[in-house]
Regions:
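Structural preference for solvent-exposed beta-strand-turn elements
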Residues: 1-239
């Protein structure tokens, strides 16, 4: 049996630079679709999923300008499509965040069922439950198509049957431009949920309670641009 032997007694010291949190970045970048203006996002981690999201946003019509290795400007005022290509969307698990962002901003979205890092079966039923509660009609197949009745989602009370980080973030994105107030009960509490809420609030959203099991989102008419720095990755810091 292989083993590691660790001899202690040597205090650690010094400094390291920690990358931006991956799980925050892969939600915040598609959340830029909700912004009616230019948003500058800093402390971007250098991972393939981020590069793919840049390509997807560009394909949808957004203007994506990479400023340096860790900063980007995204302008989604020129988005002309709510249907990212099958080949790109299915390559990353986090592509489901495009559903909440596009549905919230444009009232409809068609996104391929995601693949990517597949740690067993991770259904999106809680995402769909939240969208339907807010008045969306959702059909599922190789693609998930969601459309808001009347073109805009309505605030609703959403109780999560199981705690889901992805669903909490997706419903939060869908709700920021909805008509009325949305509450998410039994919400996930991870740091990247708080970071997404802070990003959206910095752009003009009204989200309270992120980081607790009850999140309240009061819908606003529009989000405007701004600058935001993604939190450091706690997993990288701990390892």
């Amino acid at each position: 049996m292989n083993k590691y032997i660790i001899h202690g007694g040597r205090p650690l010291f010094g400094e390291v630079t920690i990358s931006g949190a991956k799980n925050a970045a892969v939600a915040i970048i598609p959340a830029a679709l909700l912004v009616d203006g230019v948003c500058r996002i800093e402390n971007i981690p250098q991972i393939s999923d981020v590069t793919l999201f840049f390509s997807i946003l560009d394909e949808l019509g957004a203007r994506v300008r990479v400023l340096n290795q860790h900063a980007v400007e995204i302008d989604c005022r020129t988005v002309r499509s709510t249907h990212p290509s099958y080949d790109m969307a299915r390559r990353i698990r986090a592509s489901y965040y495009l559903l909440g962002a596009l549905l919230g901003r444009f009232g409809e979205a068609t996104v391929a069922m995601p693949g990517g890092c597949n740690f067993g079966v991770r259904p999106i039923d809680q995402h769909v439950k939240g969208f339907r509660a807010m008045g969306a009609e959702v059909t599922e197949g190789n693609f998930v198509h969601a459309a808001a009745r009347g073109g805009r989602l309505a605030g609703a009370n959403v109780y999560m049957d199981v705690v889901s980080v992805g669903a909490t973030m997706n419903i939060m994105m869908a709700a920021v431009l909805a008509d009325g107030t949305t509450t998410i009960e039994n919400a996930a509490k991870e740091p990247h949920i708080v970071d997404l809420a802070n990003f959206l609030n910095s752009m003009g959203a009204d989200i309270k309670g992120a980081g607790t099991d009850s999140i309240r989102i009061k819908g606003v008419e529009r989000l405007s641009g701004g600058t935001y720095c993604i939190i450091p990755d706690q997993i990288e810091a701990g390892t």
